[in-house]
Amino acid sequence: MAQGTVKWFNAEKGFGFISTENGQDVFAHFSAIQTSGFKTLEEGQKVAFDVEEGQRGPQAVNITKLA
């Protein structure tokens, strides 16, 4: 499982990007966030996730927020 920092996330549109520890930007969709209730991420938040190859490049799945 990779770790990274939320680069930006638009809650209205339901997506954003996570910067990995090696500097790669990975697409993040709200449906991949593993939490109950309103699924959103905050800029600068630390997260753990798996990476899958999506239709337009690397995509984060199984996103969990780190304390």
UniProtKB/Swiss-Prot annotation:
- Domain called CSD: residue spans: 4-63
Q: Where in the cell is it found?
A: Cytoplasm
Q: What Gene3D superfamilies does the record point to?
A: 6.20.370.130, Nucleic acid-binding proteins
Q: Which GO MF term does the entry hold, naming one?
A: DNA binding
Q: Which UniProt keywords apply?
A: Activator, Cytoplasm, DNA-binding, Stress response, Transcription, Transcription regulation
First-listed, main subcellular location of the protein, grouped into a coarse class: cytoplasm
Q: Which PROSITE patterns match?
A: CSD_1, CSD_2
SUPFAM superfamilies referenced in this protein's UniProt entry, alphabetically: Nucleic acid-binding proteins (SSF50249)
Top-level taxon of origin = Bacteria
* Induction remark: In response to low temperature.
A cellular component term, taken from the record's GO annotations: cytoplasm
Q: Which InterPro entries match?
A: Cold_shock_CspA, Cold_shock_domain, CSD, CSD_CS, CSP_DNA-bd, NA-bd_OB-fold
Report the record's disulfide bonds: none
Q: Which residues form the signal peptide?
A: none
**What is annotated about its quaternary structure and interactions?**
Homodimer.
Matching entries from PANTHER family are given as:
COLD SHOCK DOMAIN CONTAINING PROTEINS
Q: What is this protein called?
A: Major cold shock protein
